[in-house]
């Protein structure tokens, strides 16, 4: 086991896949500058910078993928994915179906999201639910350092376009990663903490918040199970349903706003397939339906907090107060 940062885990995944498959290449905003080791090893034909032109970058990637390459593009900040929607949704997402399977689009789109850098609404907007709704796309949002590497390797090998959202605050966060080949299948959730009283479902950085809430709940004798979705599309319904049938209570947590979000989809699945197991109404703890603030204090206030999650869980099990 090695201890490396998230940025290094992503770099390892890219390097290993580029060595394994000569069709893999990477380009985008600052790629050759930020990945000088890849540029030195693989050259400018496979590692290159681009202008700040998200639509052109995504369009070039879709064309390269259709012609048999496996591009990994970096568009930096998630809000600017809106400038690449046509290439990602209408070309890469649909043309495999529209061509009767004659074309595949094995491309990965890297984008950073999440609060913590006080970059304001221009650079911080959680758009994952929008892409979950688009046919033909897969959507990944890792939490652990090991999953950043393992899920990226799976995304690169997948024959479909994959949106790979990275939390912008965790790049220098160290964590354990297995040595050598480490691949995590898409569509499989993780259960970093087992429990019997309430299920906390989350993804990306909010998993850490859920684990902190579970620690608070343990002080009150409440045993919370935490599920890290890892992949938002395809969604691991089986793991969610198995947990809810055991605990009878569900709270979904994410930084994105509540309306039509991932939490709403998880709640709908449980309502349709495990309603009889529920002992209490499903709860969502989310960010507000508002642009991201630039103030650090306001940004922190807008994030789901462990206290709020614990309080919601206590209400579901019939307790009244959260520990000080």
Predicted regions: what they are:
Residues 1-161, 165-166, ...:
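Thiamine diphosphate
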């Amino acid at each position: 086991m090695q201890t490396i940062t998230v940025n290094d885990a992503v770099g390892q995944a890219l390097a290993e896949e580029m060595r394994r498959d000569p069709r893999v290449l990477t380009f985008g905003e600052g790629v050759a500058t930020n990945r000088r080791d890849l540029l030195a090893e693989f050259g400018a034909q496979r590692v290159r910078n681009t202008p700040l032109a998200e639509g052109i970058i995504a369009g070039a990637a879709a064309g390269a993928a259709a012609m048999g390459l496996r591009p990994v593009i970096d568009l930096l900040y998630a809000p600017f994915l809106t400038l690449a929607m046509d290439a990602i949704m209408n070309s890469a997402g649909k043309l495999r179906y529209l061509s009767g399977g004659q074309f595949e689009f094995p491309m990965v789109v890297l984008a950073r999201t999440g609060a913590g850098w006080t970059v304001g609404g221009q650079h911080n907007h959680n758009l994952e639910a929008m892409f979950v709704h688009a046919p033909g796309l897969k959507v990944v949002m890792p939490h652990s350092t090991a999953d950043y590497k393992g899920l990226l390797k799976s995304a690169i090998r997948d024959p479909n376009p994959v949106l790979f959202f990275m939390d912008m605050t965790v790049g220098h966060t160290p964590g354990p990663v297995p040595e050598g080949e480490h691949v995590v299948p898409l569509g499989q959730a993780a259960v970093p903490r087992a429990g019997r009283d309430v299920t906390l479902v989350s993804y990306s950085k909010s998993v850490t918040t859920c684990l902190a809430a579970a620690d608070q709940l343990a002080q009150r004798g409440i045993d919370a199970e935490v599920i890290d979705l890892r992949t938002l599309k395809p969604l691991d319904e089986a793991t969610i349903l198995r947990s809810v049938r055991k605990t009878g209570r569900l709270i979904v947590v994410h930084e994105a706003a509540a309306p039509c979000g991932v939490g709403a989809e998880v709640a709908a699945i449980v309502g349709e397939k495990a309603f009889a197991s529920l002992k209490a109404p499903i709860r969502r703890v989310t960010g507000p339906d508002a642009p991201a603030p630039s103030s650090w204090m306001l940004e922190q206030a807008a994030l789901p907090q462990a206290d709020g999650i614990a309080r919601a869980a206590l209400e579901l099990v019939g307790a009244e107060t959260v520990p000080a």
